[in-house]
């Protein structure tokens, strides 16, 4: 459910971007709908609404949600202010690389790896497995950032499609792979845990 909520602003961004540009009258002001700049405005507004509603309901946002919201506001505002989509193209790479940096930092700062802090309440795994998982997430975020950057500046006609659905596809594939990897280790943990007598 959380992943779907986080996806709402990006989906609205995609829908508005794909509209044929047209001029509409809103309270006496002419606004252009369709294309990158109105889509960017929609991304900013919908992000504020979605995360604002989450904050009101939960009384907090996760750190990853704060980072996503701040990046959206910063890069989106720069895109609109300078009328240049270059800023927005850097948003996904920067956010992904900051996530990678956080996972890297947890190897040196704190008493637990970041992936263990996130998933440790639900899973019991050996420390070497947690280490491999953390490294896998680092590699994933670094790759996603590089892929987004490459597509954004190389394939102008499809970068928005990739930003929305390519990133989602990579995430789904990675999570499936992680699930397969974890299922093997969880099975091993079950078979090595002594069973109690009824």
UniProtKB/Swiss-Prot annotation:
Q: Where in the cell is it found?
A: Cell inner membrane
InterPro entries attached to this UniProt entry = YciB
Gene Ontology cellular-component terms for this entry are: plasma membrane
Query: Is the Ubl conjugation keyword given for this protein?
Result: no
Report the protein's function. Answer: Plays a role in cell envelope biogenesis, maintenance of cell envelope integrity and membrane homeostasis.
- Similarity section: Belongs to the YciB family.
Protein name, as recorded: Inner membrane-spanning protein YciB
- Taxonomic source organism: Pseudomonas fluorescens (strain Pf0-1)
